[in-house]
UniProtKB/Swiss-Prot annotation:
Organism, as annotated: Cupriavidus necator (strain ATCC 17699 / DSM 428 / KCTC 22496 / NCIMB 10442 / H16 / Stanier 337) (Ralstonia eutropha)
Catalytic reaction(s) noted: 3-dehydro-L-erythronate + ATP = 3-dehydro-4-O-phospho-L-erythronate + ADP + H(+); 3-dehydro-D-erythronate + ATP = 3-dehydro-4-O-phospho-D-erythronate + ADP + H(+)
Domain of life the protein comes from: Bacteria
Protein name: 3-oxo-tetronate kinase
Record's keyword annotation contains ATP-binding: yes
EC id: 2.7.1.217
Transferase as UniProt keyword: yes
SUPFAM superfamilies: YgbK-like
Record's signal peptide: none
C-alpha cells in the first residue's frame, strides 16, 4: 500500500475490532464528507495504490474475540502503519453493544494504544442513537432495554450481562475508569472539555461518555478534538470531520461516497443468529425466494454442505440466500453438541468456501450478514481494501473492492438493517 502524497495525507486513522464494524465506521466518515478507504486486516505494501486520495483510513482487524495479548499486538501494528501514513488522530472502534468479556478486549487494547501514543486519557462511547444504542449515567441501552435485557446477554461469544459500562470496562482495565456524565455533555463542548480536564486530574484514564442523541456525539467530538485517541462505536466519529474542517484541513466535498455500480450475479450469505438477521431471513423466505439452510451438525459430520450450496446457487437464475441463521434455542442446542467455537468456525468456513466458489463462477455482488461471517468471507474472496460508498441502511454502506475487476459487497453487523435489507442491498450494489 503506497503512502499518501505529500500534498494530501490522510487525517484520521482508525482501528476496528471486526470487519462490519470497520465498514460501519467508514460509512459514518463518508456520510460526513471524508473520502475513506478500509483495509482488510493489516495492510501489505502494494495492496492499495490510491491511498493518497483518502481523508480517512480504517484498518479492519478480526480481534474482538481473540486472546487479549493478540488483539493488543495486532492493534499496535495497525497504529504503527496508520502513523506512517501521516494520520493525525486515531479512533479505536468496537461494537455499539460493547461486545467484550472481563478479559477484554476493549480495555487492554485501549490502554495499549494510549501508552503507544504517550497519552493519558481517552473516552469510551459506543453510543449509536440512530440504531437505538444510547448511554445514560454510564448504562447502555439498546432501544428501550438495558444492554443485559436486550438479547445481547445471549451472545454466544461475548454475553453482555451488565449494562453498567463503567463496571464492564473497569473489570478489563488496569487503570482507573470514570464517567463523563450527561450533565456536562448537555451543556456543550466547552463544559464537556472542562469535565474531561477534571477527570484527568482525578487520575481517570478512560471515561465512559454519556450520549443519547447525535447532537451529544457532535459535542463529544468537538470536546475531544485534541485527544490523540478516541474510542467508541461508529457514532463517536460523527463530529470528527467537522473538527478537521474547522482547522482548515478538510474541504467541503460532495463526492465522498462516489463508487461504481457493479453488474453481475449476486448472493446473500447469512451467518448471524441475531434478531434482525432472523427477521431478514424470514422475510426472504416469506417471499418465496430461493434459500438453502446450512446445518452445522451436517458440517460436523463431514458432509459436502458447501458443494450442495454451490449446486443450489447454480440451479437458480436469481440471487439465492445461503444461511445458517437460526433461533437462540437452536443455536444453543448446536453449541451444546459441538462447542461454541467449533460451531461458529464450521459455519464461517463453510460460508467462506461457498463465497470463493461463487466468485470463481462469476458472482460479483455479495451481501453478508454477521461480523464474524463477513470477516471469513472477505478473506476467502481475497479482498485487500474497499472504497466506501453510499449508505444502504444505518451503519451499512455499499462498498467496492480496489481491484482491476472490482466486486461489490455489503457487510453488515448481525443486528443492523430492516426486514427487506437483503433485497435493498442487492439492488443498491448493482446501481439500482
Amino acid at each position: 500500500m503506497t503512502a499518501g502524497t505529500l500534498a494530501h495525507r490522510p487525517l484520521l486513522g482508525c482501528i476496528a475490532d471486526d470487519f462490519t464494524g470497520a465498514t460501519d465506521l467508514a460509512n459514518t466518515l463518508v456520510r460526513n464528507g471524508m473520502r475513506t478507504v478500509q483495509t482488510i486486516g493489516l495492510p501489505d505494501v502494494g495492496a492499495v495504490q490510491d491511498i493518497g486520495e483518502a481523508d480517512a483510513l480504517v484498518v479492519a482487524l478480526k480481534s474482538r474475540t481473540i486472546p487479549a495479548v493478540e488483539a493488543v499486538a495486532q492493534s499496535l501494528a495497525a497504529l504503527q502503519w496508520l502513523r506512517a501514513q501521516g494520520c493525525r488522530q486515531f479512533v479505536f472502534k468496537y461494537c455499539s453493544t460493547f461486545d467484550s468479556t472481563d478479559a477484554g478486549n476493549i480495555g487492554p487494547v485501549a490502554e495499549a494504544l494510549l501508552a503507544a501514543l504517550d497519552s493519558d486519557f481517552t473516552i469510551a462511547c459506543p453510543a449509536f442513537p440512530e440504531n437505538g444504542r444510547t448511554i445514560f449515567r454510564g448504562h447502555l441501552f439498546v432501544g428501550d432495554a438495558l444492554l443485559n435485557e436486550s438479547g445481547m446477554e445471549h451472545h454466544p461469544l461475548t454475553p453482555m450481562t451488565d449494562a453498567s459500562l463503567v463496571r464492564v470496562l473497569q473489570r478489563q482495565s488496569k487503570n482507573k475508569v470514570g464517567l463523563l456524565r450527561y450533565d456536562a455533555v448537555a451543556r456543550g463542548a466547552h463544559a464537556t472539555a472542562e469535565r474531561i480536564a477534571a477527570l484527568r486530574s482525578d487520575g481517570v484514564r478512560m471515561a465512559i461518555a454519556d450520549a443519547v442523541s447525535d447532537a451529544d456525539l457532535f459535542t463529544l467530538g468537538e470536546a475531544c478534538a485534541n485527544l490523540p485517541l478516541i474510542t467508541g462505536g461508529s457514532g463517536i466519529a460523527l463530529g470528527l470531520p467537522e473538527n478537521f474542517r474547522r482547522a482548515g484541513l478538510l474541504p467541503q466535498r460532495g463526492d465522498a461516497a462516489s463508487v461504481p455500480a457493479i453488474d453481475g450475479p449476486g448472493v446473500v450469505l447469512a451467518g448471524s443468529a441475531s434478531r434482525a438477521t432472523n427477521g431478514q431471513v424470514a422475510r426472504w423466505l416469506e417471499q418465496g425466494r430461493p434459500a438453502l439452510r446450512i446445518d452445522p451438525l451436517a458440517l460436523a459430520r463431514g458432509e459436502a454442505v458447501a458443494d450442495a450450496a454451490l449446486a443450489f446457487a447454480a440451479g437458480h437464475g436469481e440471487p439465492v440466500l445461503i444461511y445458517a441463521t437460526s433461533s437462540p434455542d437452536e443455536v444453543k442446542a448446536v453449541q451444546a453438541e459441538l462447542g461454541v467455537e467449533r460451531a461458529g468456525h464450521l459455519v464461517e468456513q463453510c460460508l467462506a468456501t461457498v463465497a470463493a466458489g461463487l466468485l470463481a463462477r462469476g458472482t460479483r455482488r455479495f451481501v453478508v450478514a454477521g461480523g464474524e461471517t463477513s470477516g471469513a468471507v472477505v478473506q476467502a474472496l481475497g479482498v485487500r481494501a474497499l472504497r466506501i460508498g453510499a449508505q444502504i441502511a444505518p451503519g451499512v454502506p455499499a462498498t467496492v473492492t480496489l481491484d482491476a475487476k472490482p466486486l461489490a459487497l455489503a457487510l453488515k453487523s448481525g443486528n443492523f438493517g430492516g426486514p427487506d435489507f437483503f433485497d435493498e442491498a442487492l439492488r443498491q450494489l448493482g446501481g439500482h
